[in-house]
Structures are given as structure tokens and as C-alpha cells.
Amino acid sequence: MNAIANLAATPGADLGECLADLAVDALIDEAELSPKPALVDRRGNGAHADLHLGLMQASALSLWPCFKEMADAAQRHGRIDARLRGVLGQLGRDGEAAMLRTTEGVNTHRGAIWALGLLVAAAALEPRRTQAGEVAARAGRIALLDDPAAAIGDSHGERVRRRYGVGGAREEARLCFPRAVRHGLPQLWRSREGGAGEQNARLDALLAIMSVLDDTCVLHRAGRVGLAAMQDGARAVLAAGGSASLAGRRRLCELDRRLLALNASPGGAADLLAACLFLDRLPAVSGGWAGSL
């Protein structure tokens, strides 16, 4: 599946299908990006005993109907209010159930359903306004609304938020995804402009997010020690010239070894990288669905 090729070949394509394609492509591209420190990639399963690349790919594909339905619901409803928030919440829970059926109970993309689901809905609400900041701001307005049907959470992320006093995925969304919009995307663009290949530019974007994110996945697995190792190590790679430089590559290998030793996997940063890739592509492809509006 390649959303950009699909849009180029079929001008006037259905908006919901295009946005779902983009979201799934972003998840698969994030999973396949290598070498990511302590994360599932083409080399192996990172710090995860229960995950592998094929499972991540299958999980991403299973979420296509969820993203399509979220986009369709937002386009039909046409405004941000409690009713839309409730519909999106239920669609997200349905998508999570489909994911868990596909993975036989393994949580591969729960955080990504939240982040990308909000961004897909936000893009569908105003499909001619596709700049990253605009889409993230609309997503933040949706996230600020409570979903009365949502269960009171006792997930790893919720427990980490309470224990360490960090914001987590919910606050990141309510603040309009600042680590993606203000850190990940600018680094992606800087690395491209500096001559880095696309894979290295994406790695640098991931590292920029890791350098500033209070990643609840890392905190859950390795506490404050793990978080400091992630943030300091990511900054060291970028300061050494990024993943495209020899010195940066050496630092990246050191970071990978350190996080693996701590069993610390930056899953929250990975979700935000997928959000970056989705937002990065929106302006370039939005003309493909103009004829369907």
C-alpha cells in the first residue's frame, strides 16, 4: 500500500480512504525504519519479547477500517463537539479490539490509534487546511473534550503518569502534539535540507522527539534512569551530527545498547514519529482528494 502513489494515480479519490492510507503508511514506515534504538525494526524486536516486524505491519493494516471510519465520521459531522468526541472514542475502542484480534492480544499500536486517530479526524474536518500546525491544533481541540464512555484507565501509561507526574499521550494531544510539530518535523526537514537521506532524516526526527519527550513507555520499563538515558543519548547523537554522520552513527549504536541493557523501549516517541510522517505528507497529497469534496 502506498498512499502517495494511490493519490497521484486517482485524483478525486475518497477522502477517508486517502487519510486511512496515509495513517497506515506512516505506521508501517515507522515500524520498518532502521536502526531505531531498542525498538522493533528490520534488525529484530528491540527490547520487546512479544513483538516483531511482521506483527507490527499486520497490526497497522488492521487499523485501516478504524482510520477510514474516523475520517468519515469527522467529515459527516463537520464540527468539533462532544458528540464527535464520543463517536471517535467508540471507533478507537473498536479499532483497538480489531488490533488485539490480529495480534492475539499483544498491544502493538494503542497509543498510535489515539494520536493518528485524532489527526485523521482533524484532517477530515477541514481537508483544505493541511499544514501540520493547523491539523494538530484541531486534533488538540478534540482531545480536550472528555469521552464519557471511556473506561477509567489503569493502564501502564496512566500509572506512570500518576507516579512520575508526567503528561503522557493525553496531554501531548491536548497540547496539540508539540513534540511532533515543534521538534520532530523541524528536525525531519532540517536533515533533509542538510543532505541526509530519507531514512536518516526520519531517524533524526525520532531522536529529536526522544530528546524532549517524557516517554511513559520508557518510564514504565526503566524509570527515571531509563528516561535520562534516552533523552541524553538522543541529544548526543544529534550533537554529533545526526544519524547520517559517522560520529552520530556511533552514538546511535551506543544509545541502542544502553536502552537494550535497561529494557527501555521508546514506544511513545515511535508513535509521535508516525504522527510526524502523517503530518509531513498531508500538504503534498491533499490535492488528490479535492475533486471528491
Curated annotation (Swiss-Prot):
The keyword Kinase does not apply. GO terms for biological process: prosthetic group biosynthetic process. It catalyses: 3'-dephospho-CoA + ATP = 2'-(5''-triphospho-alpha-D-ribosyl)-3'-dephospho-CoA + adenine. Pfam families: CitG. The keyword ATP-binding applies. Its EC number is 2.4.2.52. GO terms for molecular function: ATP binding; triphosphoribosyl-dephospho-CoA synthase activity. It is an enzyme of class 2 (transferase). InterPro entries: CitG, TriPribosyl-deP-CoA_syn. PANTHER family: 2-(5''-TRIPHOSPHORIBOSYL)-3'-DEPHOSPHOCOENZYME-A SYNTHASE (PTHR30201:SF2), TRIPHOSPHORIBOSYL-DEPHOSPHO-COA SYNTHASE (PTHR30201). Belongs to the CitG/MdcB family. Involved in the formation of 2-(5''-phosphoribosyl)-3'-dephosphocoenzyme-A, the prosthetic group of the acyl-carrier protein of the malonate decarboxylase. This is Probable 2-(5''-triphosphoribosyl)-3'-dephosphocoenzyme-A synthase. It comes from Pseudomonas aeruginosa (strain ATCC 15692 / DSM 22644 / CIP 104116 / JCM 14847 / LMG 12228 / 1C / PRS 101 / PAO1).
